[in-house]
Amino acid sequence: MSIVVKNNIHWVGQRDWEVRDFHGTEYKTLRGSSYNSYLIREEKNVLIDTVDHKFSREFVQNLRNEIDLADIDYIVINHAEEDHAGALTELMAQIPDTPIYCTANAIDSINGHHHHPEWNFNVVKTGDTLDIGNGKQLIFVETPMLHWPDSMMTYLTGDAVLFSNDAFGQHYCDEHLFNDEVDQTELFEQCQRYYANILTPFSRLVTPKITEILGFNLPVDMIATSHGVVWRDNPTQIVELYLKWAADYQEDRITIFYDTMSNNTRMMADAIAQGIAETDPRVAVKIFNVARSDKNEILTNVFRSKGVLVGTSTMNNVMMPKIAGLVEEMTGLRFRNKRASAFGSHGWSGGAVDRLSTRLQDAGFEMSLSLKAKWRPDQDALELCREHGREIARQWALAPLPQSTVNKVVKEETSATTTADLGPRMQCSVCQWIYDPAKGEPMQDVAPGTPWSEVPDNFLCPECSLGKDVFEELASEAK
C-alpha cells in the first residue's frame, strides 16, 4: 500500500512493528520502526531508497503493484546501510541496468553488501542536480558521517521536499505517516532518543551541515525521513531541535545509574539522590539499575543531564560488567559539557571505583570526587552518601541555590529538641533502613511527626518489605 506524501510523491516503504533490536543489540526499538522509501512520478520516475533486506521480496512485490518496474528511470540511494538499501539485490535482479545515483563512498558500501560492481552507478556530489522533468530537479547534498561516510540528502525542487536520510528521523512505528497525526509526546521522546543514541558522536558536524543546507536558501515544505514520520507540519521544528541538541546540550538534570551485587551500592545511590534533592530541589534526579533498565533510556538521560553519578560494586577487583559495557558506549557517544562522579561498595578490595573514575575521565567527563563504602553501609556511611549528594548538588548547580536549602542545616539544628520529643528512630535489622519519626513515611500514609509507637501494625519496611517486628531502636539512640 502506498501513501501520498505530496503531489506525485508516494511513500512505498515498510512498517516494522516487531523489531526490538537495531544495530545488533545496540539500540532498543521499543516502538518498532519503519523503512521509508519514496516513489516520485514526474516525466522521469525516481525511487528514493529501498527497505530493510528482510522485507526485500515484499517490497518488490508491493512496488510492482504501484509501477511497472521497467518504468523506474532512476534509483537514488541516500545511504547504503541495509535498512535503507537492503532490497537492492532483489530489485536490481528485475531491472539490472537502472542507473543508481549515490555518493562515491556509497558505491563501496553497496558493493560490500551486495557484491554487484557491474551495476550502473553514478557518483553525485554536493550541488549536483538531476532533471526529472516537469520543471523539477533533484539536488544532492553530501552529509558524510551523519552517520556513515556514504550519507547524503536529496532535495526535490518544486515540491520543496527534503529527503533527509537518517537525520531528523526516529525509530517509531505508527499507522499514520505525518508528524501532526501522531502522539506528540511519544514523537518528541523518540526523536530525542534517536539523536542521543545515534547522532550524538557527530554533533560537531550537525551544526555546520545544517548551516550549509540552509545556505542554499531553498524552501522546505516537508522533510521526508528514512525512519519514522514525515515532517509536514512546521517541518523545521525538528531542525531547530537538532541545532539545540548539537550545542553541548544539557538540562538541570542528574542521572544516577548503578549495578549492585548485594543491594549495598543501591543503598548508596538512594542516599546520594536524597542529598542532591535536599540541597537543590530544582534539579531532576533520575536513578537506574542497569540490570533492570533499558540502556538507551539511560543514555538518553545522560545526554539530557549536566552530570552523571555511576555506581558499581567491586567484583574480582574490577567494575560490574554491565557498568563497564555502558561506560564503553558512553565513551563512543562522546558526550560533552558533562560532569561525573563514581561511587560503589566493596568488601576486601575496592578497585572498581578507581577504575570507573579513570574510564569516565577517559570518556571526556569532568570528574568530581568519588565515594566508596565498605560492605553494607551503616547509618554513618549513608549519611556520608547524603553529604556527597549535597556536595555534588552544590558543585554542579547551574544557578545559585535556593536560600531555603542554604539555611536548612540551621533549621534542622534548631528543631533537634522537637525531634527528640518524638522518640527514637527505628532501624530495620535486615536492610538497615531507618524510620525517622520527624519524616514519617508518606508512601504508607504515615505523616511526619508520627512516633514509632503510633505507626500502624501493618507497616512494612520500604526497602525489604518486612514488618514492624524486625525493627530495633537505633543503637546510637538506645538508652
Curated annotation (Swiss-Prot):
Fe cation 3 binds at C428, C431, C461, C464. Pfam families: Flavodoxin_1, ODP, Rubredoxin. It comes from the Bacteria. Signal peptide: none annotated. Its cofactor is Fe cation; FMN. Disulfide bonds: none annotated. Residues 254-393 form the Flavodoxin-like domain. Residues 30-210 are annotated as: Zinc metallo-hydrolase. Fe cation 2 binds at D83, D166, H227. Keywords: Cytoplasm, Electron transport, Flavoprotein, FMN, Iron, Metal-binding, Oxidoreductase, Transport. InterPro entries: Anaer_NO_rdtase_flvorubredoxin, Flavodoxin/NO_synth, Flavoprotein-like_sf, Metallo-B-lactamas, ODP_dom, RibonucZ/Hydroxyglut_hydro, Rubredoxin-like_dom, Rubredoxin-O_OxRdtase. One of its GO terms (cellular component) is cytoplasm. Pathway: Nitrogen metabolism; nitric oxide reduction. Fe cation 1 binds at H79, E81, H147, D166. SUPFAM superfamilies: Flavoproteins, Metallo-hydrolase/oxidoreductase, Rubredoxin-like. GO terms for molecular function: electron transfer activity; FMN binding; iron ion binding; nitric oxide reductase activity. Binds 3 Fe cations per monomer. Binds 1 FMN per monomer. Residues 423-474 form the Rubredoxin-like domain. It is found in: Cytoplasm. In the N-terminal section; belongs to the zinc metallo-hydrolase group 3 family. Homotetramer. Anaerobic nitric oxide reductase; uses NADH to detoxify nitric oxide (NO), protecting several 4Fe-4S NO-sensitive enzymes. Has at least 2 reductase partners, only one of which (NorW, flavorubredoxin reductase) has been identified. NO probably binds to the di-iron center; electrons enter from the NorW at rubredoxin and are transferred sequentially to the FMN center and the di-iron center. Also able to function as an aerobic oxygen reductase. This is Anaerobic nitric oxide reductase flavorubredoxin. The lineage of its organism: Bacteria, Pseudomonadati, Pseudomonadota, Gammaproteobacteria, Enterobacterales. The gene is norV.
